[in-house]
Design a protein with these regions (language model features):
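Conserved ATP-utilizing enzyme core subdomain
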Residues: 1-44, 110-111, 120-133
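Buried hydrophobic packing segments
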Residues: 21, 47, 51, 101-105
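A short glycine/serine-rich beta->alpha loop
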Residues: 30-34, 86-93
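Hydrophobic, well-ordered secondary-structure elements that form the walls
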Residues: 43, 77, 98
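Phosphate/pyrophosphate-binding loops at sites that engage ATP/ADP/AMP, CoA/4′-phosphopantetheine
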Residues: 49-59
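Glycine-rich phosphate-binding loops at beta-strand->alpha-helix junctions
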Residues: 58-77
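Glycine-rich phosphate-binding/hydrolytic loop that grips phosphoryl groups
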Residues: 89-133
Length: 133
C-alpha cells in the first residue's frame, strides 16, 4: 500500500480503510479472530515505524479514539513500541473529537488559522469552515 511509503506529515480517513485495507483483508480466508489480530499487529507496527521520526522519546503514548478501548491493541502497541500506553477517561476518549471540532469552530469564528500544514500535509496553514448567520 503506497500510503505507508509517503513522507510525513500524512493523515488517514475512513475511506482509506474501506478502499485500501478492507479489500486486502477480505482477500484472505483466515478466521475473523486471525484477521483482527493481524490488523492490531499491523497498527502497532506502523505506529512504531512512525514513532522513529518523532523527536520526543517519552516513555508513554497517550491514546484516544476507538482503539483506546481495545486492550489487545494496546498490548500490541506496548510490545512493538516499548512504551506504556496511557488511556484517558472514557469521557475524553468519547468526546475529544467534538471538542477539537468545537475549538476549530471558535478559531474559524475569530478568523484565525485552524488547520496547520504541519499536521495535515497541506501546502499552507488555512482557515477552514463556513459560518452561517
Amino acid at each position: 500500500v503506497t500510503f505507508f511509503a509517503l513522507p510525513f506529515p500524512k493523515s488517514l480517513d475512513n475511506g482509506f480503510s474501506s478502499n485500501e485495507m478492507i479489500p486486502i483483508i477480505d482477500s484472505y480466508s483466515y478466521s475473523i479472530a486471525d484477521k483482527l489480530a493481524t490488523c492490531c499487529e499491523h497498527i502497532a507496527m506502523q505506529l512504531n515505524t512512525s514513532l522513529q521520526f518523532v523527536q520526543d522519546k517519552s516513555e508513554a503514548i497517550f491514546t484516544t479514539g476507538g482503539g483506546a478501548f481495545n486492550r489487545y491493541l494496546q498490548q500490541r502497541i506496548e510490545a512493538q513500541t516499548n512504551r506504556k500506553v496511557v488511556v484517558p477517561s472514557a469521557e475524553i476518549v468519547n468526546y475529544k473529537e467534538a471538542l477539537i471540532i468545537a475549538f476549530m469552530g471558535v478559531l474559524r469564528w475569530r478568523n484565525e488559522i485552524n488547520v496547520l500544514q504541519t499536521v495535515t500535509g497541506a501546502k499552507a496553514d488555512s482557515v477552514n469552515g463556513a459560518i452561517y448567520y
